[in-house]
Amino acid sequence: MHRGGDRSTDPSSGPAPGSRGGGDGRFGRGPSRWSSGGGGGGSGSPPHRFSRGGGGGGGDGGGGGGGGGRFHPYRGPSDHSGGGGYRSGGGGEYGEPGSGPRHRYGSGRGDHSDHDNRNNYVKLFIGSVPRTATEDDVRPLFEEHGDVVEVALIKDRKTGEQQGCCFVKYATSEEAERAIRALHNQYTLPGAMGPIQVRYADGERERHGAIEHKLFVASLNKQATAKEIEEIFAPYGHVEDVYIMKDGMRQSRGCGFVKFSSREPALAAMSALSGNYVMRGCEQPLIIRFADPKRPRPGESRGGPAFGGPGFSPRSDAALVIRPTANLDEPRGRHMPPDSWHPSSPRSAPHQFNNFGSDNPMAPKGSTVTSTTDTATFRPQMFSGNGSLSSQTAVPSSSHMGMNPPPMAQGHHLGGQQIPPLQKLPGLPQNFPVQLQNNQLGQPLQGPAQQIGQLQVPQSMGPGSFGQNRLSGQLPVSQPLMQQNASVSAVQVPSAVSNSMQAIPGQQHLPSNVAPQMLQQPVQQMPSQAPQLLLQQQAALQSSYQSSQQAIYQLQQQLQLMQQQQQSNLNHQQPTQGQPVQSSNPGAPNAIIPSNINTIPQQATSPAVPLTCNWTEHTSPEGFKYYYNSITRESKWDKPEEYVLYEQQQQQQQQQKLLLLQQHQQKLAMQQLQSPPQAQTHPAMQPVQQIPQAQQGQQQMQMKQQELNYTQLQTPGAIDPSRIQQGIQSAQERAWKS
């Protein structure tokens, strides 16, 4: 297709004076977006489509070269002199050839091809450009530092709105470097929220032979400034630039780039700080890698979206760092090993960090960025580098069980050796003693089949068994491992319990390869079973508490009957003298209280008024009740008021006793839930206070017998709850007989 003479006038006549297309015009446009100028018409072949400049004139004799291009204040007159086809026009004026379409930015370059020109220009990426900015706002700023070939504002293909960034092309790399040094983070365009970012576009620096020594730094404090970051890296060499990556709200993403003047200080800073230095306000050390430039993927051309072609969207800049920084900013332990960031393969890091390099400020819209945090950075230690499942997978990760995770670096030193399951869970024994203690508090007197630790070995496992009947079978197998692991020594199981478990057929001789498989699910189920165990123990304690309350109430009724009988017997046996006779055994009710309530203080049970009355109640041979006064020897059929008050006082006393008993039972139940069983035996061994001297000897004998019964709980031999119950019953019977 011929484009050279589409808009040209007659070749022989030349351009009209003052016309934009002639040699006298100052401004012109090229045939395409990337080139300008065009060859003249005439008898020769049509000019090259992408040629710059070209000979004007017509016919067989070509005139002077028509270079063209707009004037800018940076270049001197020598750059625009005529001749040679470089910015030359007829008569030495700044114009373009008389024929050929006009280029938008008009940079005549003689007869060079487009391929050569593509290798000469340098493309810069400009960030933080206002969405309302135009080319006239951007171009003058950059023309102060060199010859601007083109300014391309990036717009959305669907909406047509600007994306807040643009590309600027310079003719030489020196001009581009000059613009970067003068404008990067130093100039704010009108209407912008912050200074513009000026840096090389994708692959431009490498294409021109310049190498940038830039580090990608993660785990930065989001409140840190560029100055604070520079102070961290300054001791290792001259820091040329610090760039903090920010989101759409201008908030730091916790990562950025630090540029050094040479490779040696950059390497020294990375070796000294990566994995070792923790910034103030952060929980994990810095993660530092070289910010290698992005390399084109196979099948991806430089004109594609990643290199500023059609379909490019700067919004994907936000997608570049959101995923890695979201993973990096999450706390994963107080100390992270230095090698936790190493990728699975030595060459994977450059490709994964290329998206953050200096030469890739943005990526195509909707592009997927693969970061090392997804594959290798925080890869569970049970996986090897090649993604295969290693031998460490027998036990699930401790982070799923609510325990303190082991150091991540252990996975690198384990290799392929087989590790015992209990050694790989150092946090596991922290849960075992709690469950043992809680289980030891639950119902030690219900039957001989249950033992103190609720480790019910016979057939069906109780609620206190580990892992619901599966982990209990592993205890005999893993018993040598428990002895080897120092952290498991907190689990103190009586020898009778362990011996009885070893004696069970079918559970002792389990194959060794079954143990890891059976340990997987029970260990994960233990935290969820703890509340169920506590609820079951609480229900059992409540039932035992209710039964004890009923027994106490029956004892109180019997106590009242015995008091009345004793009082009546004393009244019948009294001598007939005139002196007042009082009850000779006021402390008898306290002496007959069973041993399980012997810790109630005497002061709380004694009423304010002495429980004495001269009237007693009797029954006549006919079956009628009458009342007799032992002092006046008076008998009445009606109940005397003095006797009515006496009965009320007795009722109040009984109510107070019942309340105190209930409170005491509740306290004991709470202590059983919170303290080990050894501490439970002490309340039962406390002696009764303020007992009459006549009964102290007998009470001491009862307490000694109780001590003998309860000390059997602490012996490592076989424990029979029926013996404990028999001891309590015998103590109660002796108390009644006294």
Curated annotation (Swiss-Prot):
In what ranges is there compositional bias, type Polar residues? Answer: 342-358, 383-401, 575-594, 723-732
Q: Please name the SUPFAM superfamilies in this protein's record.
A: RNA-binding domain, RBD, WW domain
Principal cellular location given in the protein's record: nucleus
Cite the WW domain residue spans from the record.
609-642
Q: Which keywords are on file for this protein?
A: Developmental protein, Differentiation, Flowering, Nucleus, Repeat, RNA-binding
Question: Can the keyword Chloroplast be found in this entry's annotation?
Answer: no
Which stretches does UniProt call biased (Basic and acidic residues)? 109-118
Q: Where in the cell is it found?
A: Nucleus
Gly residues bias spans: 52-70, 81-98, 301-311
Question: Looking at the record, which segments are called Disordered?
Answer: 1-118, 292-414, 566-594, 670-738
Q: In which tissues is it expressed?
A: Mostly expressed in young flowers (panicles) and stems, and also present in young seedlings leaves and roots.
Q: Which Pfam families match?
A: RRM_1 (PF00076), WW (PF00397)
Q: Name one GO biological process term.
A: regulation of cell size
Q: Where is the composition biased (Low complexity)?
A: 368-377, 683-706
Q: Does the record carry RNA-binding as a key word?
A: yes
> What are the record's GO terms for cellular component?
nucleus; spliceosomal complex
- Which InterPro entries does the UniProt record give? Hud_Sxl_RNA, Nucleotide-bd_a/b_plait_sf, RBD_domain_sf, RRM_dom, WW_dom, WW_dom_sf
Tell me, what does this protein do in biology? Answer: Plays a major role in the promotion of the transition of the vegetative meristem to reproductive development. Required for RNA-mediated chromatin silencing of a range of loci in the genome. Cotranscriptionally recognizes aberrant RNA and marks it for silencing. Controls alternative cleavage and polyadenylation on pre-mRNAs and antisense RNAs. Regulates flowering time, seed size and cell volume, probably via the modulation of cell size.
Q: PANTHER family, alphabetically?
A: RNA BINDING PROTEIN
* Quaternary data: Interacts with FY. Binds to SF1, FIK, RPRD1B, Os09g0509000/LOC_Os09g33480 and MADS8.
The entry's protein name is: Flowering time control protein FCA
